[in-house]
Amino acid sequence: MLSRRRGVNTTMTTINHTPAGEQGGKKRLIHRFSWVSLLVCWLIWVLNAYDREMILRLGPVISKEFSLSPEQWGNVVALIMVALAVLDIPGSIWSDRYGSGWKRARFQVPLVLGYTALSFLSGIKAISHGLTAFVLLRVGVNLGAGWGEPVGVSNTAEWWPKEKRGFALGVHHTGYPIGALLSGVVASLVLATFGEGSWRYCFLLALIVAIPLMIFWAKYSTADRINTLYLHIDSQGMTRPATQESSHVAKGEGMKTFLRTLRNRNISLTAGNTLLTQIVYMGINVVLPPYLYHVSGLSLAASAGLSIIFTLTGTLGQIIWPWLSDSFGRKRTLIVCGLWMSIGIALFYFATNMPRLIAIQLFFGLVANAVWPIYYAMASDSAEERATSTANGIITTAMFIGGGISPLLMGWLIQFGGGWENPAGYIYAFFTMAGCALLGMLLQLMTTDKTPRKAH
């Protein structure tokens, strides 16, 4: 009834095939529904990143409390991080079966509330006082957080025209460096204010923010709104993200759709690059806090705070590079970013004083976070329309497998180099990460660009 009063067509409408170029002289406007959905999905991503990254900021103090060696800490982090990969593909298939567009948000709400509630429990010492209990709770958190990533990415893409997909996913993914930055700031404040024994307080925040946010999102995401949005996209001469306001993968077709998507060369090669890049990104997060504490001699609070400097330029990079990929092309942008990342991580060899450490972090940060939305845009551009979340789930799974490998590898390299106090292991880690970034760039060279070209 509401949609009829507003004059909105409630039936599923087909795409307007008017070429975008025919409206080339008209300024294309983005509907407010796109901006509101982007803000909500961005805030969800900030919470996801904050919660996921916090354990890395707290690495030295957790290792100290439970008397963990570098290799033992690497094993703990690997177990927690590999949980991010477990439910991505089955969860994405389930999400695609439930429905795309406005229905996707209804799927997202209980998921976000569930994993932030588990995180809250891990912040209560009476529940998580032992290492086993704490690790099991964090594994539960990451099962949900990993599942939520491709769902959130797909949700963002389905509220924006295809020509602006790179920009939208880039802005969405600025939530990750912001969340990572907040994790360092909050960890530093908690440790400095309450002492190192109160580090669990850091895990209480996410649920408090998530509850009102998800109540709003459940009410906001409706068929009427997204249908109005798609009609507006048609009127602006741009391409809808989907031909109808909601579609789904039919029952019994999920595995067939997944296998077709996995066989897509663009998606599988981009997933390989994603895995290697995540070894780099997770590696620098695992390595920097103990490097600053054990080698540079900073306090626990200072090492947590100064290990996230690269997120300052990471936010800027996540807007510029994905936006540039809309016109320059996803493939070429990823190749440039891969080479930049390899050089940036190798430069940590020269980070022998604080000014150099800060400068190198800022240089590395310009691409450290930028590549993820471009990977998702590449997968979304190459996927079947109804299988967007499945394609993004493959990317996410590859990413989190890399995230599980990375702490094992970094812990072993630090141990091999002589342990926490010896700089040699950290140098081995930096050059190993540089090689991974370079190898990922070579994989991307073998893909074909599917970027929509009528973005301007």
In which residue ranges do the predicted regions lie?
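C-terminal membrane-cytosol helix-exit motif in multi-pass small-molecule transporters
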Residues: 207-237, 440-448
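C-terminal transmembrane helical hairpin of 12-TM major facilitator-type secondary transporters
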Residues: 325, 330-378
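Cytoplasmic helix-loop-helix junction between adjacent transmembrane helices
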Residues: 137-174
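Central cavity-lining transmembrane alpha-helices of secondary-active solute carriers
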Residues: 78-93, 308-320
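Extracytoplasmic gate region of multi-pass secondary transporters
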Residues: 55-56, 264-315, 406-407
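Cytoplasmic membrane-interface "Motif A"-like loop-to-helix N-cap segments
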Residues: 97-112, 327-338
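Helix-loop-helix hairpin linking two adjacent transmembrane segments in secondary transporters
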Residues: 172-225
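C-terminal ends and interior cores of transmembrane alpha-helices
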Residues: 113-128, 339-352
